[in-house]
């Protein structure tokens, strides 16, 4: 069994996510407390009892999703379960880098908090939207975006073959949706997001994030050194990056990649293909929702796909991995 961990990004959040896991595992409660001590945010209260509008704000969403994933990782660590490879969608790439030993846990939490604040506060003025287009070829969606006359819109996430997320000005996204329907798309769905993420419109946020990245240490060696990390071993785990769907290497300038990450399209379709080529046969999505699990299943029906987002499927996954 060759396992990959997948970490979700923004849009997977919902009030109450992970509450039953929090209530039943001390390891999870300890992680929420750890994050609260670092960020001075009551992540548990915000996630379990808060207002949906507040949770959906980027500065809150990102740290809440990260915390849930980290809490579950602590439980998997207790059971000596770890991945050979990890990856995530957008925000989830940061979770993967923390888990895999590239970024220290404390510094990673601080960085994600700052990233969420920058992406919330430095969105240019205007009405922005994102939408998932299903059932069209990549080049057709790109052609549609280029043909829109009512404003800025561009592909932001290449999720899997047959699904692309577009991002841009609200009117332009709406026009692109209509053009996609005329072109025969199977479905077009607007997403729960509050900005033109993974587009050049977040250039100011990218520049400010770069200043924060300069303050942290990136571990490019094969061994995790001194990081309080949620893994049984101290050996580095490969991370597949969003920007091109390839593994990080020792030669990569990770800080520069993460600076570009915020304004560049996510190539999760290529990420999936890379993990399959590397022999992954068991994928475990860790965190709210099951979006990434769906991407894997639509790409390859032969591999085992599990997701952990509540107490029931956590226990099912633990039982399965004991085989």
Feature annotation, model-predicted:
Residues 61-63, 196, 265:
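Glycine-rich phosphate/pyrophosphate-binding beta-alpha loops
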Residues 2-4, 234-237, 241, 247, ...:
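Cys-dependent protein tyrosine phosphatase-like superfamily
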Residues 22-23, 147-148, 181-183, 298-301, ...:
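Short, solvent-exposed amphipathic alpha-helical segments in soluble enzyme
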Residues 77, 181, 276-277:
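Non-catalytic positions within long, well-ordered alpha-helices that form the structural scaffold/packing
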Residues 1-141, 222, 282-297, 303-311:
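FabD-like malonyl-/acyl-CoA
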Residues 10-12, 38-39, 100-226, 230-260:
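Alpha/beta catalytic cores of group-transfer enzymes, especially the acyltransferase/condensing modules
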